[in-house]
């Protein structure tokens, strides 16, 4: 995973997850991480999928900005022949609207099984071509003008594999005028792990296990990146982020993701929508965009 992978994981979790509450008495840091990982799981009877509109606004400094609007499709599929902790595959399709990127599509297939890598494709309408992003060079391209790469989006990973976690403290933080009780976790990179950062702090909300804030530091103790949920909303009774802001201090880029019109489709999505060979036929208007 590259530099913004952990912050990107939180962003994607905010986009695609329906969360569940869990009793918190006497909980350990590793148990909190397990619950955070479970945010990416959905019930096996949830076969409808989710639609949303996502706007990515990037501020590069010196009055230089960019903005992209994407139509988001998400569907989790299940393989009952596999173990319960490896039976899900999350399919995400992002359709670019407007500007030079009109009609471009990014498709990602992310297995729940940590031993299996995500697969990614990019559809280029001008060429009528779908390209799988396999090499590091392919995956290093900027996603929607941000400091996140395509590879970052495909790197959800397991925090427990790369970091030793402790509960640093408990406190309350404010998000959009409301106060939330959180655990502040300190994640220290394991000596033999290929971790992006030496130290990560996460502010995890105690009821829904949302990562409301994250700070990532290098081995010199310098803050390299941070992420925060700026505005929270509700979807089917659960709290979800509506505005997420990330800062890459190395590149001086501030990216703001706004999620709107989060909804179920009128007709359940099917896995055919996420077929790499059929991306050129996708019509967002058919899904209410």
Residue ranges and their predicted role:
Residues 2-12:
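Bacterial N-terminal signal peptides that target proteins for export
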Residues 50-81:
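N-terminal, post-signal-peptide region of Sec/Tat-exported proteins
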Residues 40-48, 85-87, 236-238:
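Edge/loop elements at the starts and ends of beta-strands within beta-rich repeat scaffolds
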């Amino acid at each position: 995973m590259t530099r913004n992978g952990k912050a990107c994981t939180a962003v994607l979790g905010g986009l695609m997850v329906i969360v569940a509450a869990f009793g918190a008495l006497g909980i350990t840091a590793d148990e909190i991480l397990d619950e955070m990982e479970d945010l990416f799981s959905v019930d096996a009877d949830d076969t409808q999928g989710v639609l949303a509109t996502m706007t990515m606004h990037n501020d590069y400094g010196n009055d230089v900005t960019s903005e992209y609007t994407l139509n988001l499709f998400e569907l989790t599929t299940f393989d009952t022949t596999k173990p319960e902790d490896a039976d899900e595959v999350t399919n995400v399709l992002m359709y670019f609207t407007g500007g030079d990127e009109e009609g471009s599509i990014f498709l990602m297939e992310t297995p729940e099984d940590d031993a299996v890598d995500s697969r990614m494709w990019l559809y280029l309408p001008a060429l009528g071509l779908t390209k799988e992003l396999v090499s590091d060079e392919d995956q290093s391209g900027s996603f929607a003008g941000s400091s996140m790469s395509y590879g970052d989006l495909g790197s959800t990973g397991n925090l427990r594999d790369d970091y030793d976690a402790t509960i640093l403290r408990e406190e309350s933080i404010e998000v959009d005028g409301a106060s939330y009780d959180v655990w502040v976790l300190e994640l220290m990179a394991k000596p033999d792990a290929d971790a992006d950062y030496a130290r990560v702090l996460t502010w995890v909300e105690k009821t829904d296990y949302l990562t409301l804030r994250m700070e990532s530091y290098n081995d010199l103790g310098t803050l390299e990146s941070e992420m925060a949920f700026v505005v929270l909303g509700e979807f089917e009774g659960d709290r979800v982020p509506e505005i997420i802001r990330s800062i890459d201090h190395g590149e001086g880029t501030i990216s703001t993701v706004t999620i709107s019109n989060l909804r179920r489709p009128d007709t359940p999505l099917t896995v055919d929508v996420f077929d790499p060979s059929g991306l050129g036929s996708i019509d967002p208007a058919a899904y209410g965009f």
